[in-house]
Regions:
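Helical hairpin unit composed of two closely spaced alpha helices linked by a short loop
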Residues: 34-64, 68-75, 81-90
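Short hydrophobic beta-strand motif reused across regulatory alpha/beta modules
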Residues: 48-52, 98, 112-120
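Terminal peptide-recognition signature
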Residues: 7, 30, 45, 71, ...
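The conserved cystathionine-beta-synthase
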Residues: 16-34, 60, 78-106, 118-126
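Short gly/pro-enriched beta-turn/loop segments at secondary-structure junctions
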Residues: 2, 9-12, 25, 32-35, ...
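Bateman (tandem CBS) regulatory domains
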Residues: 2-14, 64-76
Length: 126
């Protein structure tokens, strides 16, 4: 059985920005990393939010005049690194989302990685 840890992207692959990042910078990271989302972290590196394409659409007017903390969805859904990939895939399907940040349940809230629905599908998780 495959766990999230085996499929997740970690380190520099993670699309993360501090909460005071201007939206132009967040869009750049979102494009460079290729996940279609960007995670938002506080000064301690803890995941506090996520910016998705839906957030971008909701804030189209004057988008670039904002910082990420004004646009983000707070308290994003996450998955534990030891969770089964099949469970993560089921969550993504049920919630109609394509990515989950991987955060250890007993940690300090800092993300270990990000899992994309395509990672599960490529690995044959169904």
């Amino acid at each position: 059985l495959t766990t999230v840890r085996h499929l997740m992207h970690a380190g520099d692959e993670m699309p993360l920005v501090p909460s005071d990042t201007p939206m132009a910078g967040a869009l750049l990271v979102m494009s460079q990393k290729g996940f279609g989302v960007v995670g938002v972290t506080d000064a301690g590196g803890r995941l506090t939010g996520i910016v998705t394409d839906g957030d971008l659409r909701r804030h189209m007017d004057g988008l670039l005049s904002h910082v990420v903390s004004e646009v983000m969805t707070h308290n994003p859904l996450t998955v534990a690194p030891d969770a089964l990939a099949q469970s993560a895939l089921a969550t993504m399907n049920a919630r109609k989302i394509t990515c989950l940040f991987v955060v250890p349940p007993d940690g300090d809230g800092r993300p270990d990685g990000i899992l994309q629905i395509h990672d599960c599908l490529r690995a044959g998780v169904a």
